[in-house]
């Protein structure tokens, strides 16, 4: 059984960013909410869109920060502190440049890898890096100087289809995580390739 009490999907707010690669984490939380029959609603106390769901008998909070990506920790910290949720009880879904579209992987801990959303969350959790991550592959533009424009742009229809398939599989693997355990969820998700 999972000890996860908070699932976060990182994104930038606003319609202009809605389907950009950087918002892949939010796509996952939106799909998880839909599958659970929940509606994400704006909660200014936590600087984000929130929902409460039950996954295999466990009470879990969903959160999509409505701050900009580099201020995601403000939202995550506010909700985690209020409900006394420890870093190891948090799963943060985010876009991952170092994996191709169609791939998603669970991971425990680690650095921020240059991801500004993760960097701010780590800072707001008192530099505790011990939270779980769901890395959703978006691919790399090939040149470091193009990364900012790349993550803030929409994917090609082919890449979007691959990313959507990975998000769907991540949601199914989340069911395994809560019904069984992280090892089985990792095995299922890490074996998937769209």
From Swiss-Prot:
Keywords: Cytoplasm, Hydrolase, RNA-binding, tRNA-binding
GO biological process, alphabetically ordered: protein quality control for misfolded or incompletely synthesized proteins; rescue of stalled ribosome
Site (Stabilizes the basic form of H active site to accept a proton): residue numbering on this chain: 95
Catalytic reactions of this protein: an N-acyl-L-alpha-aminoacyl-tRNA + H2O = an N-acyl-L-amino acid + a tRNA + H(+)
InterPro entries per record: Pept_tRNA_hydro (IPR001328), Pept_tRNA_hydro_CS (IPR018171), Pept_tRNA_hydro_sf (IPR036416)
Main localisation: cytoplasm
A GO term, aspect molecular function: peptidyl-tRNA hydrolase activity
Family label: Belongs to the PTH family.
Function recorded in the entry: Hydrolyzes ribosome-free peptidyl-tRNAs (with 1 or more amino acids incorporated), which drop off the ribosome during protein synthesis, or as a result of ribosome stalling. Catalyzes the release of premature peptidyl moieties from peptidyl-tRNA molecules trapped in stalled 50S ribosomal subunits, and thus maintains levels of free tRNAs and 50S ribosomes.
Identification of the protein by name: Peptidyl-tRNA hydrolase
Organism of derivation: Shewanella halifaxensis (strain HAW-EB4)
């Amino acid at each position: 059984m999972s000890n996860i009490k908070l699932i976060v999907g990182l994104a930038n707010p606003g319609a202009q960013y809605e389907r950009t690669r950087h918002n892949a984490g939010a796509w996952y939380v939106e799909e998880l909410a839909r599958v659970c029959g929940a509606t994400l609603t704006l909660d200014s106390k936590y600087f984000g869109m929130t929902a409460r769901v039950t996954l295999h008998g466990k009470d879990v909070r969903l959160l999509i920060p409505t701050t900009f990506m580099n201020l995601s920790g403000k939202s995550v910290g506010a909700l985690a502190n209020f409900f006394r949720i420890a870093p190891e009880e948090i799963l943060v879904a985010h876009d991952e440049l170092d994996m191709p579209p169609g791939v998603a992987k669970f991971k425990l801990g680690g650095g921020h890898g240059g991801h500004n959303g993760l960097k701010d969350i780590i800072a707001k959790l008192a530099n505790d890096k011990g939270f779980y991550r769901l890395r959703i592959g978006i691919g790399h533009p090939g040149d470091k100087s193009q990364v900012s424009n790349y993550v803030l742009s929409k994917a090609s229809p082919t890449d979007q289809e691959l990313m959507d398939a990975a998000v769907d599989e991540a949601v199914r693997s989340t069911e395994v995580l809560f019904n069984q355990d992280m090892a089985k969820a990792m095995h299922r998700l890490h074996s998937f390739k769209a």
